[in-house]
């Protein structure tokens, strides 16, 4: 995945220099990570297929993920760096950290960042937290995250592995929300209804 991102930004002089700097001195990422927006721009990544805005990769997203992937650090150092960049970053930087997690050798030691993102009301962070690394969320936290997506209007297509993880407990939670909305004459999203049906079928 990171090779694909680097290829999409091939020819970007800033990223080439930044990558070399990070490979030579991992501490350089402290200043280069925030600068990716200026260095590579914030436009959609070249060649990015059309899709929901919350799942679209931007050039600065890709550049930051590439920089993280090029860090040559032992796991403990990498985990500490990832936490620091997330803690000190703005929303765009935090989203990039979350998007990078599936491709970093951090085990489950950054799962707390998912919990932090899921406590926010920023749909970009919530969506990024539910990518492949969300496999480290325990079932209860994952179900609550899916429910939060429905409340926030975040498309459930952003939830990695929802077809595999949907279960009876999620079906019960979604059905309860569906009933509440029906009683209040409020719409229940089509994608949530599809996941509810899938969860009911998988638990039958």
Regions of interest found by a model, annotated:
Residues 1-74, 141-204:
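N-terminal alpha-helical scaffold/docking segments in eukaryotic complex subunits
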Residues 63, 67-173:
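Eukaryote-skewed repeat-based solenoidal scaffolds used as protein-protein interaction platforms
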